[in-house]
């Protein structure tokens, strides 16, 4: 489980193509969200609008086969007190980044 920081991941979305054709982009967004939640143990996952538009760019029937993402993890205090919330913000990565810890 990575602590607070920024990480680069490559998410394979080929499995989406096994499903029904009209639900592929919806399932791809859900798979990205579940992948980030599993790898970062985040309570809340926020997907950036640019990543969402990239997945939906080729219509709902033909999402990309894989996506390179940057995940920023931070812990936030709730306003009313209580436990800290672990939040992951997911955005689209550039092509030259290698998977692993991102320093930048």
UniProtKB/Swiss-Prot annotation:
One of its GO terms (biological process) is cytoplasmic translation. Pfam families: Ribosomal_L31e. The keyword Ribosomal protein applies. One of its GO terms (cellular component) is cytosolic large ribosomal subunit. One of its GO terms (molecular function) is structural constituent of ribosome. Gene3D superfamilies: 3.10.440.10. It comes from the Archaea. This is Large ribosomal subunit protein eL31. The lineage of its organism: Archaea, Thermoproteota, Thermoprotei, Desulfurococcales, Desulfurococcaceae. Belongs to the eukaryotic ribosomal protein eL31 family. Keywords: Ribonucleoprotein, Ribosomal protein. It comes from Aeropyrum pernix (strain ATCC 700893 / DSM 11879 / JCM 9820 / NBRC 100138 / K1). InterPro entries: Ribosomal_eL31, Ribosomal_eL31_CS, Ribosomal_eL31_dom_sf. The keyword Zinc-finger does not apply.
